[in-house]
Design a protein with these regions (language model features):
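Basic, low-complexity intrinsically disordered segments
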Residues: 1-167
């Protein structure tokens, strides 16, 4: 708002270091992303995604933390639309990248786990199922981003009662 901008212009900040240091976020997350050196086929990208999922699980285990939600974003390469056949067969949404080139819209999805975990097997299975569900097998992959949401330490997760569904 204008009042904050005017105060800032005059060198007065209403937010002090005390407020900044006392801030505690409501939730935490870890994110890992890769821009691939060249366009990957879905088969090759699948291997990279599995490695990223296993790495995320090992990071959680190392930090004694758990997650119950995974978010995967797959960015496609402009080469996916470079030849005439690809442009005519692709029926999805097309966006423009930072360089003004046409590129297929990224794929994005979320997988919710039944309970908080740091199990490499459970996380990998969920991420691979999500990958298979959201990715277009006819396009070339250029960017991959995996985020673990709702990250808490193991002790906090053990103390938090799980919700029960009554039918």
């Amino acid at each position: 708002n204008a009042e904050l901008l005017i105060d800032h212009a005059w060198g007065w900040e209403p937010c002090t270091m005390e407020f900044i240091k006392a801030y505690k976020p409501a939730t935490n997350s870890f994110s890992s992303g890769q821009v691939l050196q060249e366009p990957y086929t879905v088969r090759k990208a699948r291997v990279v995604v599995r490695e990223m999922a296993e790495s995320a699980a090992l990071d959680l285990l190392d930090k004694r933390m758990v997650t119950d939600q995974l978010v995967l974003t797959i960015g496609y390469d402009t080469a996916s639309l470079s030849n005439e056949d690809a442009r005519t067969t692709y029926k999805g949404e097309v966006t423009t990248d930072y360089y003004g080139r046409k590129v297929p819209k990224h794929a994005h999805g979320t997988a919710n786990l039944e309970s908080p975990t740091s199990s490499a097997r459970l996380i990998s299975e969920a991420v691979m199922e999500l990958f298979d569900r959201i990715v277009n097998p006819n396009l070339l992959v250029r960017r991959i981003n995996l985020t673990t949401n709702h990250v808490v330490d193991e002790d906090t997760a053990a103390k938090t009662p799980a919700p029960v569904q009554y039918d």
